[in-house]
Swiss-Prot record:
InterPro entries: DNA_mismatch_repair_MutH, DNA_rep_MutH/RE_typeII_Sau3AI, DNA_rep_MutH/T2_RE_sf, Restrct_endonuc-II-like. This is DNA mismatch repair protein MutH. Coiled coil: none annotated. It comes from the Bacteria. Belongs to the MutH family. It comes from Actinobacillus pleuropneumoniae serotype 5b (strain L20).
Length: 226
């Protein structure tokens, strides 16, 4: 299989993703001449970058989808031996300024989640990174119910941002979507607006999918008829 090449169609992309299933990260990294880190403590995004490279994705963390010409976003998801997600899934940065007039329909979150190619990967820490296996890909589009859940949470969380209630935001807000600091460290600051409408400095905030939500996606796939 020719990896790291442009996919002209959804079928072509899915063929590559299905071909990856069953290989270890080390085997794919070897094919791509990419070094495998001993652990992911300092290379948190390495697995995602490896799969992106293998499948020829281009966007990275930019607002557009990884396969914009196909309308598909790529997400790797670390799972345990029971197939349950080990961490929340980053979707996009939250707009802390210039957010007047943004609606769910025009939001980066909705754009990124319109169609997602999920790639489950073994993520338990006792398994050496190179020996972790890649799972079966899942091409997912949110159901009407799932989109409504996402919309409700997004609108609630954006209210906190638009009205400058940044100090009230915490990870318990939102049923399926949450807002959390997204930065390399506590010194990574960006512009925001407080309740008085004044420009202030804040930690960048990111929208994340809760583990229960992504677990439902994985479980629905396992239950679906082949």
């Amino acid at each position: 299989m020719q990896l790291s090449t442009f996919s002209h169609s959804e079928d072509e992309l899915l063929k590559k993703a299905n071909w990856l299933a069953g290989f270890t990260l080390g085997e794919i990294a070897h094919q791509l001449n990419i070094d495998v880190p001993l652990d992911l403590r300092r290379d948190k995004g390495w697995v995602g970058q490896l799969i992106e490279t293998a499948l020829g994705a281009k966007a990275g963390s930019k607002p557009e989808q990884d396969f914009a010409h196909l309308g598909i976003e790529l997400k790797t998801i670390p799972i345990n031996h029971k197939g349950f997600p080990l961490e929340t899934t980053f979707v996009s940065l939250a707009p802390l300024t210039q957010n007047t007039g943004i609606t769910w329909q025009t939001s980066h979150v909705r754009h990124k989640l319109q169609k997602v190619l999920w790639i489950p990967v073994q993520g338990e820490r006792h398994i050496p990174v190179a020996e972790r296996h890649i799972g079966q890909p899942i091409l997912w589009e949110p159901s009407c119910e799932q989109e409504q859940q996402l919309k409700n949470d997004w609108e609630e969380l954006m209210e906190y941002i638009i009205f400058g209630r940044l100090n009230e935001i915490n990870a318990t807000l939102g049923e399926v979507l949450q807002l959390r600091p997204k930065g390399r460290n506590r010194r990574s600051l960006t512009a925001a607006v407080n309740q008085q409408g004044e420009r202030v400095q804040s930690l960048p905030l990111g929208f994340y999918l809760r583990k229960q939500f992504t677990a439902e996606i994985l479980q629905n796939f396992l239950r679906s008829p082949l």
